[in-house]
């Protein structure tokens, strides 16, 4: 009985406004809670598992990656894992997924879903034997190309749909939905694990064109953290080794020709006080912004220059910072 196997727990349902892409994960919500608790005099720490244990075991699989359309795919990373055993996930992982309304499938798919909801980074796992030519090509395909997705529906592709392909055919609608024939099965032995950052506009338009809405497209449309792909990839790879066995059989392939920079925002204390309608001490303001992972790169008696993480797509102006201060204060 599922009810007996799941220990008592609290499940919080959080409504996320469209501008808060950074909060579309457990870690993202915890980040805000941490800032609030610190500001209110509570002891709190914000941590996530270390990936220092990630290492390449051998170089037995050499799947290459080529990104033809860097506008639609600013960053694409992946790693090969050889000799996995696809099976049922352990109870702890199954229970975590059930608690958030997901149905466990197998250890490989469950790991990608776990990372997605924990850190907001969608992942996709390909059966490496189905990557024809040993090469991943990220590109658009000819208008009218037929492609069958995981739900067994044959779809007609647009030449504006970004696809993850091998050397012969498309395997996945990038950031939206996998193909019927490229995913992992119980017979899968070798996998290629993908972690990417796709252009939100491209994903949104493709999802609408095909009438699709998935957990992955929901996050890509709003804008994930372009600089968090490698952490999520390493954490997923370590979990695959732990739960499915195998060896990390390649270096991480990371195509990131134009890194996305953090935002620089000037905050003037007097203007902040004017917008807020009251005076908040400078030390309190600095405490709030730093607890939200913004860095103070310059400071004067009149204000601060802040380095805002790239994942905070909603904080690009001083008034956006003021809104954050008010949320936490």
Residues covered by each model-derived region:
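RNA/tRNA-interacting regions in translation and RNA-turnover enzymes
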Residues: 3-329
């Amino acid at each position: 009985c599922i009810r007996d196997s799941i220990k008592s727990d609290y499940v919080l349902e959080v409504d996320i406004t469209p501008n808060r892409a950074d909060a579309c994960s457990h870690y993202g919500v915890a980040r805000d809670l941490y800032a609030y608790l610190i500001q209110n005099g509570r002891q709190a720490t914000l941590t996530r598992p270390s990936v220092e244990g990630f290492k390449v075991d051998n170089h037995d699989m050499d799947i290459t990656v080529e990104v033809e359309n860097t506008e639609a795919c600013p960053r694409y990373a992946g790693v090969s894992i050889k000799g996995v055993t696809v099976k049922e996930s352990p109870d702890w992982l199954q229970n975590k997924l059930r608690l958030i309304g997901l149905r466990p499938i197998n250890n490989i798919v469950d790991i990608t879903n776990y990372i997605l909801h924990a850190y907001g980074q969608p992942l996709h796992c390909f059966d490496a034997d189905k990557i024809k030519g040993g090469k991943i090509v990220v590109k658009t395909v000819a208008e009218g190309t037929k492609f069958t997705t995981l739900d067994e529906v044959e779809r007609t592709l647009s030449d504006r749909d970004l696809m993850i392909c091998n050397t012969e055919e498309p395997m996945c609608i990038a950031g939206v939905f996998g193909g019927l024939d490229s995913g992992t099965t119980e017979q899968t032995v070798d996998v290629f694990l993908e972690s990417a950052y796709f252009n939100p506009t491209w994903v949104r338009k493709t999802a609408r064109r095909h009438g699709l809405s998935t957990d992955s497209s929901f996050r890509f449309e709003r804008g994930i953290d372009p600089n968090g792909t490698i952490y999520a990839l390493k954490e997923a790879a370590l979990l695959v080794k732990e739960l499915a066995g195998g060896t990390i059989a390649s270096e991480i392939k990371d195509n990131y020709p134009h890194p996305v920079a953090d935002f620089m925002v000037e905050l003037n204390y007097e203007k902040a006080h004017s917008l807020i309608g009251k005076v908040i001490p400078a030390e309190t303001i600095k405490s709030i912004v730093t607890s939200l992972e913004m860095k103070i790169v310059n400071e004067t008696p009149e204000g601060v220059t802040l380095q805002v993480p790239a994942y905070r797509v909603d904080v690009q102006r001083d008034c956006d910072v003021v809104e954050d201060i008010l949320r936490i204060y």
